[in-house]
């Protein structure tokens, strides 16, 4: 789950029926373990000053991600592409739904230059779903990866993509840009999937990962806890993801962005996240990050290196 900055378009518009129902439940009080301490190392402080002086934009900073201190210290950052509005609505997501502005074809170049200016070692690219476009935004996702690689030789790039309606030709276009990691987030379990992600399909999301695996890419996904799933359903989702070809996994606690979003059904204790990591390791994932404040791009470069080491071990 990659957070995005609040969309100004969401302010003042009429609430959807679902949003009105969600708003009847007050924002939940967070438990004691949902907090982080700011550890501002030299790399973080350097990037913070650089981003401010150069007028750069990252999801990390604009969404107030709790992991920004660790990720920036590792010279890792996440960028949102495709605009501020998404053509689909997921009940956990902070990005507003609506009619996006025309595609900005210069965006890949600007993102690549931001990556170079920041001197990043690893960059994650994520963005909105663009069902309004013939190619659903496939060119944009692919071109951004290409531009980053061209301008920043040796950098790792993670491409966190929508499902592109599961169309093999669109997915292949994205795969051919050869990101170090191809990520597509499953997010939740089958029983509540349609309620939480009505424009996506559980099986189709798994198939996106399978197609990426078959193409030869390192694959990654995310599960959000606290949306109404059961522990047994999470275990099954782990097995489904691994069977689909997913190698890397992040598991996180749902934090409600606003009253119009899905209420938090439960606060998962830290020890359960530890248990789930152990279970995912046993299932066969090559890299797992599991914790209340983990996000899908958290320590992304470290997870990628684990996948590379695992693959090298198999071929050695």
Curated annotation (Swiss-Prot):
[4Fe-4S] cluster 2 binds at residues 86, 90, 93. Pfam families: LIAS_N (PF16881), Radical_SAM (PF04055). Pathway: Protein modification; protein lipoylation via endogenous pathway; protein N(6)-(lipoyl)lysine from octanoyl-[acyl-carrier-protein]: step 2/2. It is found in: Cytoplasm. The keyword NADP does not apply. NCBIfam families: lipA, PRK05481.1, PRK12928.1. This is Lipoyl synthase.
């Amino acid at each position: 789950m990659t957070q995005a900055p609040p969309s100004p378009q969401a302010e003042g518009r009429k609430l959807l029926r679902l949003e009105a129902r969600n708003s009847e439940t007050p924002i939940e009080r967070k438990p004691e373990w949902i907090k982080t301490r700011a550890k501002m190392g030299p790399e973080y402080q350097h990037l913070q000053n650089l981003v401010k002086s150069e007028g750069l934009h990252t999801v990390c900073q604009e969404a107030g991600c709790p992991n920004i201190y660790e990720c920036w210290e590792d010279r890792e950052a996440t960028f949102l592409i495709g605009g501020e509005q998404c053509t689909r609505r997921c009940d956990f997501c902070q990005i507003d739904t609506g009619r996006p502005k025309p595609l900005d074809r210069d965006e890949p170049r600007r993102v690549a230059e931001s990556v170079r200016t920041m001197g990043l070692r690893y960059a994650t690219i994520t963005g909105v779903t663009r069902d309004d476009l013939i190619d659903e935004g496939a060119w944009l996702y692919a071109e951004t990866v290409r531009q980053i690689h061209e301008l920043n030789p040796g950098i790792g790039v993670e491409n966190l993509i929508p499902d592109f309606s599961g169309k093999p030709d669109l997915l292949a276009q994205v795969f051919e840009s050869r990101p170090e990691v191809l990520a597509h987030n499953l997010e939740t379990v089958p029983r509540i999937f349609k309620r939480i992600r009505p424009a996506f399909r559980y099986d189709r999301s798994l198939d996106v990962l399978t197609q990426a695996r078959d193409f030869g890419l390192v694959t990654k996904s995310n599960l959000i806890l606290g949306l109404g799933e059961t522990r047994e359903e999470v275990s099954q989702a782990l097995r489904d993801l691994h069977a689909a070809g997913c190698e890397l996994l992040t598991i996180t606690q749902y934090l409600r962005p606003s009253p119009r979003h899905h209420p938090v059904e439960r606060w998962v204790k830290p020890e359960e996240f530890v248990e789930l990591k152990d279970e995912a390791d046993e299932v066969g994932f090559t890299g797992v990050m599991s914790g209340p404040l983990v996000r899908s791009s958290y320590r992304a470069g470290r997870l990628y290196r684990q996948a590379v080491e695992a693959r090298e071990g198999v071929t050695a």
